[in-house]
Amino acid sequence: MSVFSKIFNAFKSIRLNDKNVVVGQQLDYLLVSSMYAEQQSAYLNSYETGLSKATIKKLLEEYWSVFDKETAIEILLDLQNRNEDKYINFVYDAFENKSNYVTILKSNLPAEEEIFRGYLDIYRNLNNVVPELIEENVIEDFAQIKRIKDAAWNYGRGAFLSRCCYEAGYLSESEMKEYLRKSFTNLKKYCSTWQEYTISYIFGRALWGGPNNSGMIQIADDLLHNEKSPLKNKKYL
């Protein structure tokens, strides 16, 4: 996809399928994929993404290293398991107690240098990400992030990838639906509203992808407020 096409697609909002529409509780499960789906200009209201086979193949292989059922399951499970990180709260505690952050991190994180440096990088990223999100009016304070974490970033990407894997033939329809259901159920442990879902996704994107997230913020606004959006009249997960 050319740079021009990506820019053009960024301004195309809310793509809906007029066939094979998902409704009811199943739609709620499906909408966990909505942030990533909007990034890719995919359908929001059907299991079918509306993307070409070539686009799906490129997304799976070049960006996610998914080539078959085995690698698909490996990546999808990893995205769900990332939310079970038992050390991340210590990083958040260190961020809230900056004068004592070294002691907090060294006392609670694994001693292995590579692992420790990984968490230290997260701590440093927080110092850039949190002020930016407050300035952009995405969050009011860090307390919002500490509760919802980047759960939607992980579950949301996994949910959309499961749809792509289904279309690529790596997951059965029942496997995809179960993955979407589980993603929704687990997401509710962190986010209680769809607005929190979008905030959590933006936070994850900012934490791992860097600054300049105005595009993601616009996507979230469209999902929550555009009259065509399936999320427009939904508040709670």
Model regions and ranges:
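Polar/charged low-complexity regulatory segments
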Residues: 2-166, 170-237
